[in-house]
């Protein structure tokens, strides 16, 4: 359900701002035992972040998330992140977590 909401939010932005978003890139993190930061391409305005195999925690306030602290992305769901793409950190809750990230401008 969250995946659909993220897509609806992006579509809503399309109509609100009168333009489409350009896909700018994709990356996958398969090791999340320690917090990771994103590597957005130049011009990226937001990212769709999907948790795979495990719930994922994130923070963007300068403090690294842990397996028990931070905002949660439920496994197999995604969120739209419109904050500072270079600042957000993500970590798995349990071993085997991965994330898929799509960037848009």
Can you say where each PLM-predicted feature lies in the sequence?
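Beta-sandwich interaction modules
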Residues: 70-85
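Surface-exposed ligand/attachment interfaces on beta-rich extracellular proteins
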Residues: 21-42
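Short, surface-exposed beta-strand/strand-loop-strand elements in extracellular ectodomains
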Residues: 50-68, 101-102
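Short, Lys/Arg-rich amphipathic alpha-helical interaction segments
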Residues: 88, 100-105
